[in-house]
A protein has these predicted regions:
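Nucleic-acid substrate recognition interfaces
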Residues: 1-367
């Protein structure tokens, strides 16, 4: 199993120039290769098998950067095509924009060309770069590749991908009829409601910083596009977004770790977050609480410990079903936040749904 560690790096001005050139060359090569594939298919109805080496003679500036970064461009383009042919909903590979694409490139470990020390990292063409290594990777891992990226705020990061990470073995598995399973139901307020009490911090980081972000964006709108002040203010806006994103990710990492450590399994409803944000006009709430990101984090952290995350069918009547007697209501409006049943059960509708999700997952595991 692979595991990645992300560290901040501090390149010199000379190294920043070379990094910028590498980002640009990778983007340029990706667009050129994609364009040639499209043109060849339009002419011959066959897929062109082009490689980075085919472009170095015509564009000699490609020789100035790491050749492995260019090789990974080819791999990324081929993966984009495979994803498209596997599922057309993903969409056809798109050209990368200079102003809206992520600035990053990936290089591989070959013959010791990458070295990692406590306070620095050596990369091809860049030599040694200062790095803040805030944690040590697990022992016994082998470095596979490094992805260098630049955030809109101007910060640089190196993501080190290691292979050989071993998950905790739970081959026997617990007795799921009595195992500790946590049911999780999506909620607009607070991201999720659990089948039992789980201490968590209040989320909604975007709304907490919304006024400050709006103020910085207003200042940006008054600046002349392309001016020095415009570029400075643009970075301030980017730092606001970065802070919100970091707060959200930190909160979700801590919460998912607590659940993965404390439970044998977790059960969630298999809902389409993208469709929910578009159809129910709750886009801001859906994106702010990061429920989709939380599910991904919880899934791989449970897998690390040899545990399971069970996805209950989205059409399972978790909200309409009474968790006490099992009766199912014919209708339940979204505005009804408290669940009432003829058996006398009265509780928060999301809590009722979370309990039903937990018990349905237990049934699925013991079936």
């Amino acid at each position: 199993m692979n595991i990645a560690y992300r560290f901040r790096i501090y390149p010199t001005e000379e190294q920043k120039i070379l990094l910028g050139k590498t980002f640009g060359c990778c983007r340029f090569l990706y667009n050129q290769m994609l364009n040639d594939k499209i043109r060849e298919y339009e002419k011959t109805k066959k897929m062109l098998k082009n490689t980075p080496a085919m472009y170095k003679k015509e564009y000699p500036f490609l020789k100035e950067i790491d050749s492995l970064a260019l090789a990974n461009v080819q791999l990324h383009l081929e993966k984009a095509y495979k994803n498209f042919f596997r599922d057309s909903k993903i969409g056809f590979p798109r050209f990368k924009s200079k102003h809206h694409s992520k600035n990053s490139y990936t290089t591989n470990v070959v013959n010791g060309n990458i070295l990692v020390e406590s306070k620095r990292i050596r990369l091809p063409k860049l030599k040694w770069i200062a790095m803040k290594k805030h944690r040590e990777p697990a022992e016994g891992l082998r470095l596979k590749s490094v992805t260098v990226s630049m955030e809109p705020s101007g910060k640089y990061f190196a993501s080190l991908l290691y292979e050989g990470y071993s998950c905790e073995n739970q081959a026997a598995g617990p007795d799921y009829s009595t195992a500790k399973i946590l049911g999780i139901d999506y909620a607009m307020q607070g991201m999720a409601v659990f089948s039992e009490k789980v201490e968590t911090e209040e989320a909604g980081f975007f709304r907490k910083n919304e006024k400050r972000l709006a103020r910085e964006q207003r200042k940006l709108s008054r600046c002349v596009r392309g001016s020095h002040n415009y570029e400075l203010q643009k970075k301030k806006v980017a730092r606001c977004h970065e802070k919100i994103r970091n707060q959200r990710r930190d909160h979700l990492h801590k919460l998912s770790r607590k659940i993965a450590d404390g439970y044998d399994a977790a059960a969630v409803e298999d809902i389409d977050m993208k469709a929910m944000g578009q159809c129910l006009h709750f886009g801001k709430s859906v994106q702010d609480n990061g429920y989709g990101m939380f599910r991904e984090m919880l899934d791989y952290k449970l897998a690390w410990k040899g545990k399971k995350m069970i996805k209950v069918d989205r059409f399972f009547p978790s909200s309409k079903k009474c968790c006490k007697c099992g009766r199912i209501k014919k209708e339940l409006k979204l505005s009804e936040r408290v669940y009432h049943c003829v058996c006398g059960n009265k509780m928060d509708r999301d809590r009722n749904a979370a309990i039903n999700i937990r018990e349905e997952a237990r049934r699925m595991l013991t079936a």
